Amino acid sequence: MALLQISEPGLSAAPHQRRLAAGIDLGTTNSLVATVRSGQAETLADEQGHHLLPSVVRYQAGGHIVGAEAREQAADDPLNTVSSIKRMMGRSLADVQARYPHLPYQMHASESGMPQLATAAGSVNPIQVSADILAALSARAQAALGGELDGVVITVPAYFDDAQRQGTKDAARLAGLHVLRLLNEPTAAAIAYGLDSAQEGVIAVYDLGGGTFDISILRLSRGVFEVLATGGDSALGGDDFDHLLADWLREQAGLRDRSDAGLARRFLDAAVAAKIALSTQQETTVCVGDWQGEVSRDQLDALIAPLVKRTLLACHRTLKDAGVTRDEVLEVVMVGGSTRVPLVRTQVGDFFGRQPLTTIDPDRVVAIGAAIQADILVGNKPDADMLLLDVIPLSLGLETMGGLVEKVIPRNTTIPVARAQEFTTFKDGQTAMMIHVLQGERELVQDNRSLARFTLRGIPPLSAGGAHIRVTFQVDADGLLSVTAMEKSTGVQAAIQVKPSYGLSEDEIVGMLKDSMANAEGDLSARMLAEQKVEAARVLESLHGALQQDSALLGEQELAAIRQAQTALQAAADGDETSAIEAAIKVLDAQTQEFAARRMDSSIRRALAGHSVDEV
């Protein structure tokens, strides 16, 4: 999808100037930054060659440090070393303390209730800590790319609410970054594998990180990823594998005393190294101090099998919440370093009945997907198959009587946006209305692009114009259009979602704009003619009903004169002269004014019949 710099056809500026963009995976345990270079998405390493940046910040009186160095000092300076700050994003202090009662920090609430952490550098909040991590990633990207970033895409969990998403945006702005978009982490992983241009269907994203497990069920339809359901376990991750193995190793070494924190740390480090080794070999040797032992993959599998089973139970629940079966899942994407464990891959494959996608480094797949999206959104791929827009390139509207288009959202409107208009029924007793959604700049339906049709049923059977239908067009930040039609008195409604940009190239957009300019005068004339034809039909329909009901109120000559004007209007409406139709409507209006007055008097007399003046 190319983010277009919308301009008038033929006036696009600097078409070959490449912009610098990055994708950022702002993780709970580790963060990464990636970019697209020479057509390939890749994560960027620091000067030591490390791609993962630990999401840890240590605050000191003279400043702060971010990453591995900060993490190494966490044990010695826990009050000033902040980690897993993502868990606090968008939450109140009370919520944080209820969820995580054993945090080592000294915290108090700000005026807005946000947690404030007391450090040697002063009080900091989750937004500021996240901004420091983002700034470190930004500096890495700018050093690698040789210039300032034009924009970034930052990933967030699919379950993040508005407050958490806004907090992430605020952190990015504080770090001096221009946020092109927040992208759901499972969607980013799917994009990294190119699933956004694949066949339509259900995709599962299994994300097992160091401290958390998330399962997301997505549906891909016409280029749109819809999150059907999310689930998981916020207290289950690869760290739990490490602790189980470390405890087992201590038992093998005959060391059950846990009072020596340094020794416990060495066993934990040894467990991590063993777990990594067993991902590629059947057994490995473990050395801690004077003790040496062996551990096999089978032994590790036996230890962690109950935890892996817990993740699969969460998958089962989330599939049920999504209303889909395992057989409906087309692809399973593996995310998170802990999915390298062979037992995890095997069990997940058996559960879903298909081989999971694992060819992209699971630690990096989310950042890579974000980088691909950022490269598109910043405008470096104008010929991409998909199209995401920060403005609407072509007007969106709906069909009205006479084959006309009523524009609801004009082109070049910034998104996200929502607009609404009210419409009424055309005929007496009308109980349904067809909503035809269109895209384009022309005046007539036939000259525009049809996006979708749906029907609003259950409209009360009132006289023409009596029912009021409010039609709302809403386009979100990803260009997804939702159209909702609601009858105001009953609240009955119908809706549809569509991707206006799906399957539409920049050349086609430009072509449609040029057509609208070239045909502007003719289109306006055609619209005026169609509008007069619709008005003529409305007048004739109304007159037909009135004559059927109250023609006895007219004398023979009066009725003949009205019939003559009625026939003349019908003849004019069958022709193509706008002025002739307009004139015929005026003649018929003049002929029926007295008839309308008599009908009003008759209606009042019928309403008052049988009632006294006092009752009135």
From Swiss-Prot:
Keywords assigned: ATP-binding, Chaperone, Nucleotide-binding
UniProt keyword Chaperone, yes or no: yes
GO biological process: iron-sulfur cluster assembly
PROSITE patterns: HSP70_1, HSP70_2, HSP70_3
Top-rank taxon, per record: Bacteria
GO MF annotation terms: ATP binding; ATP hydrolysis activity; ATP-dependent protein folding chaperone; unfolded protein binding
Similarity section: Belongs to the heat shock protein 70 family.
Summary of the function given for this chain in its UniProt record: Chaperone involved in the maturation of iron-sulfur cluster-containing proteins. Has a low intrinsic ATPase activity which is markedly stimulated by HscB. Involved in the maturation of IscU.
UniProt-listed PANTHER family: HEAT SHOCK PROTEIN 70KDA (PTHR19375)
Protein name from the UniProt record: Chaperone protein HscA
Gene transcribed to yield this protein: hscA
